[in-house]
C-alpha cells in the first residue's frame, strides 16, 4: 500500500502518547499540512500545538495488529471504555490475545480481542471506574463525519457544533474537523476514507467534553485518537492525548 506503509512496517505500530510527564514508548508527529484551507479558525489551535506537546497516554483498540504486538503493550493495569446497552463505562481492561490468519499479510497478525463492547483500551485515566457522562448524540463506528456534515449536541449544559470540511471528493485535501469553530483535526490528504465520531463525553473527570475519533488517512488504515480537555493548551478546548495507527491493506 504505497510508501507510507513501507515506512510504517519499519517503525512498527505507531502509538502517540499523552500530555502527562511520563516517557512515551514511541512518538509520531502529526502529518504535516502542506496546503492551507479557507476555514476560519483561531490562530492557535490544537493541531499546531500537538506537534510540540509531549504525549504519554497509550491507547489500543480491538484489532488484528500487523505492525506491533499488543501483548507487549497492554497489561492488566489498563482500563477500557466500553458500551453496555445505551450507557458507557470505564472499567478494568478485559481482553484476550489471539493469533488470527490474515490472507493479506505474510505474517500471522496478533489480534487484541475485547470481552465487552469495547471502544478503547487506555493505560490510564484520571476518572473513577464506573458509568461515564456522555453527550446527547448517537455515536458509533458508523457515525461518519463526511466533509460538509455537521453534528450538533450538548454536554454539561454547553452546546457544541462538530463540523467537517475538506476539498475534493475521493482524494480529499485539508480534511478538517472544527469544534465550535476551533480546529482540532486537519489532515493534508485523505484517500477514500472518512472520519468518524466514536465517543463524546467526560473521560478525565473534569466535567468537560472529551472525544474519541476515528481518523484514517487511507481506506485501509486504522487510526484512532483520544482527545482530552485536561490535555488542552491554554485557551483551547482540548488536546490530542493519544493515537494508535495500524494497517490492513492487501
Describe each model-derived feature in a short phrase.
Residues 16-18:
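C-terminal motif of bacterial Sec signal peptides marking the signal peptidase cleavage site
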Residues 20-22:
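Bacterial signal peptide processing site
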Residues 145, 187-197, 245-250:
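Repeat-based blade/solenoid architectures
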Residues 26, 30-180:
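Terminal, intrinsically disordered low-complexity segments enriched in charged/polar
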Residues 162, 205-215:
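Acidic/hydrophobic-patterned starts of short beta strands in beta-sheet-rich repeat architectures
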Residues 221-241:
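Beta-propeller blade repeat segments, especially FG-GAP/WD-type strand-to-loop junctions
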Residues 149-151, 195-203:
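Beta-propeller blade termini
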Residues 5-14:
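Sec-dependent N-terminal signal peptides
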Amino acid at each position: 500500500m504505497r510508501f507510507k506503509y513501507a515506512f510504517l512496517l519499519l517503525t512498527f505500530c505507531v502509538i502517540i502518547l499523552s500530555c502527562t510527564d511520563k516517557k512515551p514508548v514511541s512518538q509520531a508527529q502529526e502529518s504535516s499540512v502542506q496546503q492551507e484551507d479557507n476555514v476560519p479558525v483561531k490562530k492557535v489551535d490544537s493541531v499546531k500545538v500537538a506537534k510540540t506537546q509531549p504525549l504519554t497516554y497509550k491507547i489500543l483498540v480491538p484489532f488484528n495488529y500487523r505492525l506491533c504486538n499488543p501483548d507487549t503493550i497492554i497489561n492488566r493495569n489498563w482500563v477500557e471504555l466500553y458500551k453496555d446497552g445505551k450507557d458507557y463505562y470505564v472499567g478494568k481492561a478485559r481482553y484476550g490475545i489471539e493469533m488470527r490468519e490474515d490472507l493479506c499479510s505474510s505474517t500471522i497478525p496478533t489480534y487484541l480481542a475485547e470481552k465487552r463492547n469495547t471502544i478503547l483500551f487506555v493505560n490510564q485515566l484520571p476518572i473513577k471506574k464506573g458509568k461515564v457522562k456522555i453527550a446527547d448524540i448517537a455515536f458509533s463506528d458508523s457515525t461518519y463525519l463526511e466533509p460538509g456534515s455537521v453534528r450538533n449536541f450538548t454536554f454539561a449544559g454547553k452546546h457544541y457544533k462538530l463540523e467537517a470540511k475538506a476539498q475534493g471528493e475521493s482524494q480529499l485535501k485539508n480534511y478538517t474537523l472544527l469544534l465550535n469553530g476551533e480546529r482540532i483535526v486537519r489532515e493534508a490528504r485523505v484517500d477514500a476514507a472518512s472520519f468518524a465520531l466514536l465517543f463524546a463525553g467526560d473521560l478525565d473527570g473534569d466535567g468537560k467534553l472529551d472525544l474519541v475519533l476515528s481518523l484514517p488517512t487511507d481506506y485501509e488504515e486504522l487510526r484512532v485518537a483520544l482527545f482530552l480537555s485536561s490535555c488542552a493548551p491554554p485557551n483551547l478546548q482540548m488536546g490530542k492525548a493519544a493515537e494508535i495507527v495500524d494497517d490492513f491493506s492487501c
